[in-house]
């Protein structure tokens, strides 16, 4: 297999493994698969689990798509590639749990190639994972970042710090002056050594369940009421704001004529906004603000 096909094979297997693990922990709902084709080139398989015992909605999509001209969002940082043809493959997921004590999470791993006259002129990896709690626990955040740091360790002493910082900077809502959650890892435009970079992509993809599932198991049976549920729905609004205003993957998908149902799969099934909402001083809800700033968790 060539490089692209090797990455593609890994990603389809990763989607299968994550789906099996999430179905097992949910115990009730199953993923429904939607196979789709893209007119300009390629396609994918979108899987969505809804109304489960643990997950209100869990979406995970695999795609392998191509086009004749790079959209602006993809060539903004690489102007020399403007107008090149391209092919991209990736797995992207967002899980929205029902219980407000279980954090929402997002992960993405992807590979991109640009071509001219049938020759690959550039290729790079990107991805990461991040956590968005509504009622955070220090031990959960520390576990999340410990897994991230451990998987980064074989790739150099600076890898975790650099990609954690990138995550904090990327998942930041400037109009709210807060991070989307407690961070994790984020990287893009990783290139130079295919085997080493592909190994890192696999470490991130494989490490996601190690980071997330123990938190789900610890919090999924926590007792909650209407107050916690209403706060969860309110905070989900921040997720919508980020994805529609800032997220490069969403912008790339829409600009490149992607499948809107799959692109917007990340949005929560239920959400609310409330004008001028301010949590009660000293409350658990007010405490969340202390976590929405970059900090060293380990």
From Swiss-Prot:
EC assignment: 1.3.3.3
Required co-factors: a divalent metal cation
Primary site of residence: cytoplasm
InterPro entries per UniProt: Coprogen_oxidase_aer, Coprogen_oxidase_aer_sf, Coprogen_oxidase_CS
Catalysed reactions listed for this entry: coproporphyrinogen III + O2 + 2 H(+) = protoporphyrinogen IX + 2 CO2 + 2 H2O
Molecular function GO terms recorded: coproporphyrinogen oxidase activity; metal ion binding; protein homodimerization activity
Enzyme class: oxidoreductase
UniProt-annotated binding residues for substrate: 92, 108-110, 257-259
Domain of life: Bacteria
Cellular location(s): Cytoplasm
Presence of the UniProt keyword Cell wall biogenesis/degradation in the record: no
Pfam families registered for this protein in UniProt: Coprogen_oxidas (PF01218)
Metabolic or biological pathway: Porphyrin-containing compound metabolism; protoporphyrin-IX biosynthesis; protoporphyrinogen-IX from coproporphyrinogen-III (O2 route): step 1/1
SUPFAM superfamilies: Coproporphyrinogen III oxidase
Renumbered residue ranges of the record's region Important for dimerization: 239-274
Site (Important for dimerization): 175
List of residues binding a divalent metal cation: 96, 106, 145, 175
NCBIfam families named among the record's database cross-references: PRK05330.1 (NF003727)
Role this protein plays: Involved in the heme biosynthesis. Catalyzes the aerobic oxidative decarboxylation of propionate groups of rings A and B of coproporphyrinogen-III to yield the vinyl groups in protoporphyrinogen-IX.
Family from the record: Belongs to the aerobic coproporphyrinogen-III oxidase family.
Protein name per UniProt: Oxygen-dependent coproporphyrinogen-III oxidase
Annotated organism of origin: Stenotrophomonas maltophilia (strain K279a)
């Amino acid at each position: 297999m060539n490089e692209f096909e090797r990455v593609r094979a890994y990603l389809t297997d990763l989607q299968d493994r994550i789906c099996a693990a999430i179905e097992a922990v949910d115990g009730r709902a199953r993923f429904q698969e939607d196979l789709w084709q893209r007119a300009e080139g390629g396609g994918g398989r979108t899987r969505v689990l809804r109304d489960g015992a643990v997950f209100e909605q869990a979406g995970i999509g695999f795609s392998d798509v191509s086009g004749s001209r790079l959209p602006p969002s993809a060539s903004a940082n690489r102007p020399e590639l403007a107008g090149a043809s391209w092919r991209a493959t990736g797995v992207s997921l967002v899980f929205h749990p029902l219980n407000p004590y279980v954090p929402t999470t997002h992960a993405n791993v992807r590979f991109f190639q640009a071509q001219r006259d049938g020759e690959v002129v550039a290729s790079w990896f990107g991805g990461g994972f991040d956590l968005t709690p509504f009622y955070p626990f220090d031990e959960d955040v520390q576990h999340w970042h410990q897994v991230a740091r451990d998987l980064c360790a074989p790739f150099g002493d600076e890898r975790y710090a650099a990609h954690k910082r990138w995550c904090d900077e990327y998942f930041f809502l400037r109009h709210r002056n807060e991070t989307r959650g407690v961070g994790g890892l984020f990287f893009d435009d990783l290139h130079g050594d295919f085997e080493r970079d592909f190994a890192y992509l696999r470490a991130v993809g494989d490490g996601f369940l190690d980071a997330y599932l123990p938190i789900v198991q610890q919090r999924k049976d926590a007792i909650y009421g209407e107050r916690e549920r209403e706060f969860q729905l309110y905070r989900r609004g921040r997720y919508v704001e980020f994805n529609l205003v800032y997220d490069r993957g969403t912008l790339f998908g829409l600009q490149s004529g992607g499948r809107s149902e799959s692109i917007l799969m990340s949005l929560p099934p239920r959400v609310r906004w409330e004008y001028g909402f301010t949590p009660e001083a000293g409350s658990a809800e007010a405490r969340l603000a202390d976590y929405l700033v970059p900090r060293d968790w380990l």
